[in-house]
Amino acid sequence: MKQFIDFIPLLLFFIVYKLDPRPVEFAGHGFEFGGIYSATAMLIVSSVVVYGALFLRHGKLEKGQLLTLVACLVFGGLTLAFHSETFLKWKAPVVNWLFALAFAGSHFIGDRVLIKRIMGHALTLPETVWNRLNVAWIGFFLVCGAANLFVAFTFQDFWVDFKVFGSLGMTVIFLVAQGVYLSRHLHDADPSTSKPKD
């Protein structure tokens, strides 16, 4: 459910982007609805609404959600202010690389890597597996950031589709691969598997 809620602003962005631009009047003001700039405005507004509602309900936002919201406001705001989609194209790479930096930094700061802090309450794994998993997430975010940057500046007509569905597909594939990997190692930390049989 949380992943779906986080996806709502991006989905609305995609829908508005795909609309043919058309003149619209609201409160006595005329503007063009549809295309990249209307979609960017929708992304900003819907992000504020969604994450604002989550904050009111839970009293806080997760760090990842806060980073996503701030990046949306900054890069989306710059896109509208300078009327240049270049700023928005940098949003996904920068966010992914900041996540990679956070995961990498956790190897040197604190007593647990970041993935263990996130998933440790639900899984018991050997420390070496946690470390490998954390490194895998670092690689995933680096690759996602690079892929988004490459597509955004190489395939002008395709980058929004990739931003929404390509990144989602990469995430699903990675999570499936992670599940397969974890299934091979969960028993390593299960005390019951190390007990001798009578």
Swiss-Prot record:
Any single Gene Ontology cellular-component annotation: plasma membrane
Localization of this protein: Cell inner membrane
InterPro entries, per the entry: YciB
UniProt membrane topology term: Multi-pass membrane protein
Keywords on record: Cell inner membrane, Cell membrane, Membrane, Transmembrane, Transmembrane helix
Coiled-coil region list: none
Regions that span the bilayer: 36-56, 64-84, 90-110, 135-155, 162-182
Pfam families, per database record: IspA (PF04279)
Cited function: Plays a role in cell envelope biogenesis, maintenance of cell envelope integrity and membrane homeostasis.
Family: Belongs to the YciB family.
NCBIfam families found in the cross-reference section: ispZ, PRK00259.1-3, PRK00259.1-5
Protein's name according to its UniProt entry: Inner membrane-spanning protein YciB
Gene name as annotated: yciB
